[in-house]
């Protein structure tokens, strides 16, 4: 299993329906062939609660090493990915919802003052609720209540859910940084990042270079490189190598020879593949295969 996206890495899964765009689902990383879900984004806000085991989760330029009980708020339209840590499975509950459930309709006072400034703030990809601040426990308890209501309340369900979403939002808002106001510039930059990630996803098995990627975006190589590092906090080359390693895991799980895996995932040879794999995963491909078996 893997998350299905379009050519721009937008997730195609429906989160609820048009009448009530809200979804709560129990997930576990071992359901994914690679023990991870790949980079994707969606226009809905997502909040995760880890219920068992750890997870390494990255969103745009930030990486979190989450543990059981942690909650992660992922803003709308933010690229994110998650993977196992130390081969441990992770169970988590995911809540995704359309921001309109918070503000009624675009143009309203609630939407303009309290919702739009957050979802258009591209410098705010995530908030980690991990008990490091006094308000975190209240947020976590209310989020658990939301999950329970969504799963067990047949009467007035939509009203009960909306009420708790708004209470969560009211609790979260005072602790968020003020948006810079450079909405159009930031939106354009992250649209380019999504195009870069999509290009890598579609071509990682080939010999692609910075020149190829920058040409795809109609940017000069230096600007393309600076843009990616600024927005993702990693060089484009390192990101490409790490992505190729993640994609190679499904072949490792199928017991394919390392030479064939290297060829299928864009590495020049099996030795280079093994070297990069060790840097990314902390063990060789063969050691990884033994630990997974």
Regions found by a protein language model. Give the residues of each.
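Terminal helix-turn-helix DNA-binding modules in bacterial transcription factors
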Residues: 197-198, 202, 207-214, 219, ...
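Generic protein-terminus/edge-of-domain signal
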Residues: 1-71, 77-78, 86, 112-113, ...
């Amino acid at each position: 299993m893997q998350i299905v996206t379009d050519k721009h890495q937008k997730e195609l899964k429906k989160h609820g329906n048009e009448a009530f765009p809200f979804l709560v689902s129990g997930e576990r990383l071992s359901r994914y062939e690679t023990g991870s879900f790949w980079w994707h984004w969606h226009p809905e806000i997502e909040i995760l609660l880890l219920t068992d085991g750890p997870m390494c989760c990255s969103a745009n330029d930030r990486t979190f090493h989450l543990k059981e009980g942690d909650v992660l708020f992922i803003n709308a339209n933010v690229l994110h990915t998650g993977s196992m840590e130390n081969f441990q499975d992770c169970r988590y509950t995911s809540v995704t919802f359309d921001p309109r459930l918070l503000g009624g309709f675009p143009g309203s006072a609630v939407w303009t003052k309290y919702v739009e400034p957050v979802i258009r703030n591209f410098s705010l990809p995530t908030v980690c609720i991990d008990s490091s601040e006094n308000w975190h426990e209240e947020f976590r308890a209310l989020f658990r209540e939301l999950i329970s209501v969504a799963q067990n309340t047949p009467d007035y369900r939509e009203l009960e859910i909306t009420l708790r979403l708004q209470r969560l939002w009211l609790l979260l808002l005072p602790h968020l940084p003020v948006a810079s106001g450079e909405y159009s510039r930031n939106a354009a930059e992250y649209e380019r990042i999504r195009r870069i990630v999509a290009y890598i996803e579609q071509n990682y098995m080939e010999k692609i270079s910075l020149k190829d990627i920058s040409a795809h975006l109609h940017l000069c190589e230096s600007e393309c490189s600076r843009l990616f590092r600024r927005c993702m906090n990693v060089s484009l080359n390192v990101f490409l190598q790490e992505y190729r390693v993640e994609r190679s895991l499904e072949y490792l799980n199928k017991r394919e020879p390392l030479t064939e895996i290297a060829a299928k995932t864009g590495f020049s040879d099996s030795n280079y593949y093994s070297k990069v794999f060790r840097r990314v995963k902390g063990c060789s491909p063969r050691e990884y295969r033994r630990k997974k078996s």
